[in-house]
Amino acid sequence: MAQSFTGKKRIRKSFGRIPEAVQMPNLIEVQRSSYEQFLQRETRPGLRRDEGVEAVFKSVFPIKDFNERAVLEYVSYEFEEPKYDVEECIQRDMTFAAPLKVKLRLIVFETEEETGARSVKDIKEQDVYMGDIPLMTDKGTFIVNGTERVIVSQMHRSPGVFFDHDKGKTHASGKLLFAARVIPYRGSWLDFEFDAKDIVYVRIDRRRKLPATTFLYALGMDGEEILTTFYDVVPFEKRSGGWATPYKPERWRGVKPEFPLVDADTGEEVAPAGTKITARQAKKFADGGLKTLLLAPEALTGRYLARDAVNMATGEIYAEAGDELDVTSIQALADQGFSTIDVLDIDHVTVGAYMRNTLRVDKNAIREDALFDIYRVMRPGEPPTVEAAEAMFKSLFFDAERYDLSSVGRVKMNMRLEQDVSDEVRILRKEDVLAVLKVLVGLRDGRGEIDDIDNLGNRRVRSVGELLENQYRVGLLRMERAIKERMSSVDIDTVMPHDLINAKPAAAAVREFFGSSQLSQFMDQTNPLSEITHKRRLSALGPGGLTRERAGFEVRDVHPTHYGRICPIETPEGPNIGLINSLATHARVNKYGFIESPYRRVKDGKPQDEVVYMSAMEESKHVIAQSNIKVAEGEIVEDLVPGRINGEPTLLQKETVDLMDVSPRQVVSVAAALIPFLENDDANRALMGSNMQRQAVPLVQSDAPLVGTGMEAVVARDSGAVVIAKRTGVVEQIDGTRIVIRATEETDPARSGVDIYRMSKFQRSNQSTCINQRPLVKVGDRIVAGDIIADGPSTELGELALGRNALVAFMPWNGYNFEDSILISERIVRDDVFTSIHIEEFEVMARDTKLGPEEITRDIPNVGEEALRNLDEAGIVAIGAEVQPGDILVGKVTPKGESPMTPEEKLLRAIFGEKASDVRDTSLRLPPGVAGTIVDVRVFNRHGVDKDERALAIERAEIDRLGKDRDDEFAILNRNISGRLKELLIGKVALSGPKGLSRGEITAEGLAQVASGLWWQIALEDEKAMGELESLRRLFDENRKRLDRRFEDKVDKLQRGDELPPGVMKMVKVFVAVKRKLQPGDKMAGRHGNKGVISRILPIEDMPFLADGTHVDVVLNPLGVPSRMNVGQIFETHLGWACANLGKQITNLLEDWQQGGQKQALVERLTEIYGPDEELPDTEEGLVELARNLGKGVPIATPVFDGARMDDIEGHLEMAGVNKSGQSILFDGLTGEQFKRPVTVGYIYMLKLHHLVDDKIHARSIGPYSLVTQQPLGGKAQFGGQRFGEMEVWALEAYGAAYTLQEMLTVKSDDVAGRTKVYESIVRGDDTFEAGIPESFNVLVKEMRSLGLNVELENS
């Protein structure tokens, strides 16, 4: 297997046995592709598909004015370049967005007065600015007001038709009441439902119900048409001796006739009355030639007429369609000369009379009445007119502007109703309504199945593009009303398109969506995994989705169709469980929004290379085998293989299988696929494990896990945390902040031949963790496009590294690991093993106040020189300064209100001018609990405000950096082009040239005599070569101009003032890096849900140690394993132990070789570990680097559901030369004695979680009080106190601690006068106090008085 640049440096051995049939898709493709479909930025205007922005404009335009004198048409749109790039937007608190320009065409008509004919009078086209649309960064995020945000995809019920029943809950009898619901993408919902009496009703938008036939009348049907649509018609012909009817076997199966069946043609009795006719007999009668039955007249009683019985001559109606026949009415019809009576084929067993009964219940009989009824339900209180009712009914379901099923809805409807209608037809049709009612009635008759709404075939995903499209449509519709009004109010002949358009509503809708939608979330940026997971999240909440309170158990539960689409493990614990999910590793979203999973085709028991993606609906028709079935020589080995049909697990014959899974990890999400031995963990703990990995803090020095799953490199690559080479090339220059690579395979002359990659250094993430990138390459390295050239936070050598490998022993230690507590060695603190850096951001603004402008200055009243030691002349803290809580970061003074002055002050003021006392100190100080180093300061000035010295210094440094980038890129470009020019010139004949170059054939020596900048002056004899020289010259000049232009643009942006909030003159941001070592109270966890809090840090010498004197790092409680059933951690411990010991062996072999031993021993050991198929480095340098990187341990991958087995682990332990049981003899560090029995010791990958005790610990002496109750506020953020609640009061009462209780309830809480006095007495050195009345008592008295109860205190 070909290794990547970083993969060669440390090869990870995999235990996976199942080959991957398909490469894992890019993990943030969901976000990227959805937004690209929305914007279609790269597609030329004429070629754009009808989706996204294009679809929105086409649906809103053309806009006509009220008199139809003018039409505003949409032509096309294009995006301009964004004003600021991503970095600048983050620094300046701006939105990364591109201006949208739309080309509109205004057509003005004129009408001839005589003929009324319309002709085009004028056509005007113009580009109109329609606001800014935020752009997605390469990482799938949006920068909104300077913060990175993610738009989470939403799961909602797919548009279409759904059939369901009430599970017998509505009616006391437990009868199932069936219902059908037509859900459009936008528009009114249409419900059909049965009641307990089997009458079918219709509801529009969940309003009052009407008989379903009212809706059919409104569609233009009449009673007879309704009946013949829903029921077959059976003709009965009058003959002597009874009525004859055609014989159909299926109608008589299982029937016990009350009268004899007689063959109408022969007159002989076929079946006697009262005997049951079996299916075989019914078929036998037909085979015997029975075509017509003669039935007694009583056979017609209870049947329903199919058509009106009308006397054609007089028009008299004897009976109406749907009337029930009895003996008298049959006789009457016969007497009137009706020789044939058509009745409905209703037997009340297989076909019920529901629609006929509904028709009878319906009071309406004509269309107008039905329309009026619907109008009254939809708009109660308004008197209906025929036109209004007609228009309202049409707009509900048959108007494309108001009702949209969407292509998804039409496709779903076609599948459910077995129709074939184009997905362009997005409104309801009469046929759809009838088909829905037929299926509903069929369900009531026992035919067909109801739908499962939790099936992923009935739920779809709305990603970023679609969510924003809907929001933008809302904005444009708001704009449309304004445009119509403006078109009517202005002189249409002189106006231009941009005069009609105010783009604010559209821009506001987009801004509102990104700023305040429930689905637009502040990105979880704790580590690269949490970023990826956030982008792959699916939420059932949000606008148009579910709410936590209403979501039942079924919606949250795992469904068989989740297999390979949604992870069954990763979901939050708590109220959102099951409502927020994660996409499975291989899943993707198709054009209709359904989640698809990949499968390999299988033909005749042979797996094929072809991979197909299937949605839950398509998959239900297939027989699918698992990916772990044995395949030898391209054929499935076993005859019976495990698999599933329609989601149900079963054993399958290999010949029946037509699909198989592509990979065992396709079932789970990215986070769950990072847990080794996931198959050995209980699901609840696996859930915690996958959730806690997202909370791991990036450490100062990360280690990739010894025991991984092979997903680590994929996650690091796709997360955007590492730097990836865009093009193949050679590393030219490198330092800690940037890498310069010269592209070697670039053919496009318009593109630069140089790539400069800037490292992020100590940047603050959304969660205040530290983003820091480190180069992995050195000058001269050859890089291939796609290689990882720099590590980011929580990555090491291009692999995800969330924590560190720690030497762990499972044993109790003096009670310090009670209840999951963790005992750690002081070595971990000393060597900064779990030390992390957190960057806090503080900002201060100088505003223009009513009393005068605030000022950022070093000159602060009543502050000593000691407090100003870290500030520069401008009053801003210096970078690199060590700061403690309470230190001044930025000095600021605010003007005070004028107070009356004494005569002395007036005199002094007159003598010395302005005095310092009319300003107060409002400096930015470091809050309690934060101490660290200043890593960055940014100063922002308003336009037209003079920059201070500090702002100018920052600006100069930035310009120098940009200049260096430009110069380096130019130097490489110059070298590159000079090389090509030299190749072109050597061997050619020069006609003329610069001074120092002789005519004739050009040689390398001759060229060396002339400066390369003058080579352009050479004139060649060969015209073709001269043409090439000219094109090279042009390329060189263009590239130089491009570099200069880019540099000038950037400098111009720097020197221009910043856009600050209103009233702000200047803003300073200070970034403080805080180093957090591990300490008691910090939370740690493994990857298997094994979490705990550090209880004690023990001196190294007191920790238990191994026979070779190595002290363990961590002691965990063995009782944490059995009840929690996460045995994966024990497997990990054993395998980690084997890996580490193999690493020691390799280090020893490397040392032997470097001290004159044999290289072969090392190579043989590596081959034994990795197997003969693994490519080892072919150079000695590469081999040494690999061996050094393996010194800490040989990293292995044990993929989920396809990992190392018991015998693999034992084999590795043997190979590593340690006990096969994985247990070791340990000695007590305190006494030096051996423990009684062997202890499980090994390496576990431990994470430090973002629940640090430093962020939680908090103390208050005096602080802010609540306005009404005068009690201290609560919480660390408010600098609040600790609540002394009801139960705590009981405790003090129980102990009889009266004085303590009194001071808790009065002077320490809300006795305002008392607490002031206590403060004064403490200052005087007096320790007595007197308690007064708590303020909350006064609040209670006021409350009671507001209820009219007078409560007064009587002093007795």
Swiss-Prot record:
GO terms for cellular component: DNA-directed RNA polymerase complex. It catalyses: RNA(n) + a ribonucleoside 5'-triphosphate = RNA(n+1) + diphosphate. It comes from the Bacteria. CDD domains: RNA_pol_B_RPB2 (cd00653). The keyword Transcription applies. One of its GO terms (molecular function) is DNA binding. It holds the Pfam family RNA_pol_Rpb2_2. Gene3D superfamilies: 2.40.50.100, 2.40.50.150, 3.90.1100.10, DNA-directed RNA polymerase, beta subunit, external 1 domain, DNA-directed RNA polymerase, subunit 2, domain 6, RNA polymerase alpha subunit dimerisation domain, RNA polymerase Rpb2, domain 2. One of its GO terms (biological process) is DNA-templated transcription. Its EC number is 2.7.7.6. Coiled coil: none annotated. Keywords: DNA-directed RNA polymerase, Nucleotidyltransferase, Transcription, Transferase. InterPro entries: DNA-dir_RNA_pol_bsu_ext_1_sf, DNA-dir_RNA_pol_bsu_external_1, DNA-dir_RNA_pol_su2, DNA-dir_RNAP_su2_dom, DNA-dir_RNAP_su2_hyb_sf, RNA_pol_bsu_bac, RNA_pol_bsu_CS, RNA_pol_bsu_protrusion. Belongs to the RNA polymerase beta chain family. NCBIfam families: PRK00405.1, rpoB. The RNAP catalytic core consists of 2 alpha, 1 beta, 1 beta' and 1 omega subunit. When a sigma factor is associated with the core the holoenzyme is formed, which can initiate transcription. DNA-dependent RNA polymerase catalyzes the transcription of DNA into RNA using the four ribonucleoside triphosphates as substrates. This is DNA-directed RNA polymerase subunit beta. The lineage of its organism: Bacteria, Pseudomonadati, Pseudomonadota, Alphaproteobacteria, Caulobacterales. The gene is rpoB.
